[in-house]
Regions:
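Hydrophobic alpha-helical
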Residues: 141-156, 225, 245-311
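Hinge/cleft segment of the Venus flytrap/periplasmic-binding protein
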Residues: 37-78, 232, 325, 329-393
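Extracytoplasmic "Venus flytrap"
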Residues: 39-97, 101, 110-122, 127, ...
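Periplasmic-binding protein-like
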Residues: 132-141, 160-165, 208-209, 267-277, ...
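Bacterial lipoprotein signal-peptidase II cleavage site
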Residues: 25-36
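An alpha-beta-alpha
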Residues: 80, 84, 98, 189-242, ...
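Hydrophobic alpha-helical segments within soluble ligand-binding/sensing domains
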Residues: 121, 180-207, 220, 253-257, ...
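Flexible loop/hinge segments that line or gate small-molecule binding clefts
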Residues: 44, 144-145, 150-188, 206, ...
Length: 393
């Protein structure tokens, strides 16, 4: 939570970092939906100044925080089974980053594509256990608790089980047999979305935040966003609404468009539609346009999928995307699996950084495909290979 004192501290840190950089350069509606506008302990001007400093810092390259170095030789000859839907481009990037990391250490990755089917997930776990995998990864954001029986079977077979992006760093899901859920800090994502809305509107943002409760990370984002708005923007007004993955009988795309459209029509002062994920903003954007508000309502989300990065570059109602390096996440997962094999303490919080992308800072980027090294300015995998595993000099 970015409460008033934390906002001020972070803003001061951001200002110092920016000054140092400059010197270097010189060298569906839910009944529980609520409007947040009270309880602020921060003046409007100080909240805006702090938010602008946070946005400026978060628009730079995320700094890598190296976990403790260790000997990865125990990975040689091991096999990991990855169970999950790999049709989504971002999920494929996680797979390929982890594959690259394990291959560098002599381990092999086998992928079982479930295409999003629950029965296929179960079949994949059964095959991995029967195949005596050295580790199993639930790699598409489904919560491990949904497959608690399979996780327990893996534990009984002596196979460590990992999941991705269903918890919060240092707030692990309670599932018997789950070694670790490796995740972004989604509350921090929400905080950054809020800081951007505050800074962009000079502390007068009005709008709606849309979450999908079936996806735990979207709720974490909403929590971070709401706390910042309530604590640090006395003149901001946001509603918090929910859509189910099925949209209550309609498609998810129709549900998202409907929430955006009805929010604007019910409150003509709406100027921001924030979705937990940028893929959802693609559909919410159609609702904005249906409401005739494409020229005044701004959208933002998380994930930096290629279509939204292209929308940023072209100049559309989608105005900001929070990105978390996918290579970093894939390597952080691979690192923890190898720590498990080596008997090392696992790293619950890999401290994966974020970067804010806008129309201004994407103009020189190739947005036809995601390239983390270009987009973030760093090859995060090289840090692991060199500084953590000692494979490169």
């Amino acid at each position: 939570m970015l409460n008033s004192s934390r906002l001020t501290t972070i803003a001061a840190t951001a200002t110092a970092l920016l000054a140092a950089a400059a010197l270097t350069a010189c060298g569906s509606d839910d009944p529980s939906s609520a409007t947040a506008a009270s309880g602020s302990t921060t003046s409007s001007s100080s909240g805006v100044d702090a938010a602008k400093a946070i946005v400026a810092e978060a628009s730079e390259t995320p700094r890598f925080v190296a976990p403790p170095a260790f000997d990865t030789s125990s990975a040689r000859g091991k096999t990991v089974w990855w169970i999950g839907n790999v049709e989504d481009p971002i999920l494929r990037q996680w797979v390929e980053a982890a594959r690259e990391a394990w291959a560098a250490n002599g381990a092999e990755l086998r992928v079982y594509d479930t295409k999003g089917s629950i029965p296929e997930h179960v079949k994949g776990f059964d095959l991995a256990i029967a195949g005596k995998a050295d580790a199993i990864v639930l790699g598409d954001g489904f919560p491990a608790v949904q497959f608690a029986a399979q996780v327990k079977r893996a534990k009984n077979a002596g196979i460590p089980f990992f999941s991705l992006v269903t918890g919060q760093p240092r707030e692990q899901p309670s599932v018997d047999g789950l070694a670790l859920d490796v995740s972004y800090d989604y509350r921090r994502v929400g905080e950054l979305l809020a800081a951007w809305a505050i800074a962009d509107s000079d502390g007068k943002a009005q709008g709606v935040f849309i979450e999908t409760p079936a996806i735990p990370s979207s709720t974490f984002e909403r929590e971070g966003f709401q706390r910042v708005i309530e604590a640090d923007c006395p003149d901001c007004r946001f509603e918090y609404k929910q859509v189910e993955q099925t949209g209550g009988g309609a498609s998810a795309s129709d549900a998202l468009a409907n929430v955006a459209r009805t929010s604007i029509l019910s409150n003509p002062q709406t100027s921001y539609v924030i979705t937990a994920f940028d893929s959802q903003a693609l559909y919410a954007m159609s609702g904005v346009q249906q409401a005739g508000a494409g020229q005044r309502v701004k959208l933002a989300g998380f994930n930096t999928i290629v279509p939204q990065m292209q929308n940023l570059k072209k100049g559309t109602p989608f105005k900001m995307d929070v990105g978390g390096p996918n290579v970093w996440l894939g390597y952080a997962l691979a690192d923890n699996v190898m720590r498990q094999w080596a008997g090392e303490e696992l790293v619950e919080d890999p401290q994966i950084g974020f970067k804010l992308f806008t129309e201004e800072n994407v103009q020189d980027l190739n947005v036809d495909r995601e390239d983390d090294t270009e987009w973030y300015g760093v090859d995060y995998g090289s840090y692991y290979r060199r500084d953590v595993w000692g494979l490169e000099k």
